[in-house]
Amino acid sequence: VSVLAYGTGLGFRAVGERHCVGARGNVCPLGAVVPGRSTGGRCAECARLDRAHSVAADTMADDPRTYRVYLAWFGPGMVKVGITGEERGAARLREQGAVAFSWLGRGPLMAARRTEEVLRAALGVPDRIPYARKRAVRGQLPGPEERAGAVAELYARAAALEGRGWPESLERLPLEVVDQVGVFGLDRAPDADADADPAPGRSVRESAPAPVRAVRELVDGGVVAGRLVAAAGPDLHLAVADGGVVVLDTRLITGWDLTAVTRATGATEVTGSDVRVPLIDIGGGGVQGGLF
């Protein structure tokens, strides 16, 4: 396993067909072929089995572990409430690509779940935000003070509901905004080295140009190659030959056989930054061919 670092190259070619990855560590009994656009990478039966054992399925009411309720901010107008196991720390927030967040409370699973439901209904926040919406705003994020202020405002609204449907067994935690822009590399210019900081006085908008295209799906023989400049949730932001940034949702990779690509100069060979798979415009519905 190779560790990816910002500024390093990444390249691979998809081979053959995409097969179901199975469920809960078990191989798919059907060896099913799954669609290239599926972010789950599972056939219907394996997806059902995987979902049945998740916290979201509410089949683990006697779970003895402690859970935390979080308030997450993904961009202007995009907030959500969720829960995660306390032992996981902030891993769930990184997996979702939360730009900033704060813990709200901690307690037993069902108390955390009940609080989550109360807050969603009272505050009018969704239970999930599509990744397409998250991608569309990553290059246009406001500054750190505005991000922190948005989380603090949501926290104040949520805390005001304590005692109004909020289970007594859920302990409220103090506001502590965690900003993950730096962790995700969204404050870096695409030509910066791995240790560079944005220039003094430059905003995130100026330091991290917005990606305008995303990989729609992998195909047999399709190539993705570029330089890693940011990573948020499952998304890798890759700088490519035309100076733009293409997003690769790594969930689209599961189930494929991949081979490494090497740099070459031939007309049909792969260069250091090629994308030869279908792309889709971020924030729109237009589909493009690969970049050459």
Regions found by a protein language model. Name each.
Residues 1-292:
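Non-catalytic accessory segments flanking enzymatic or RNA/DNA-binding domains
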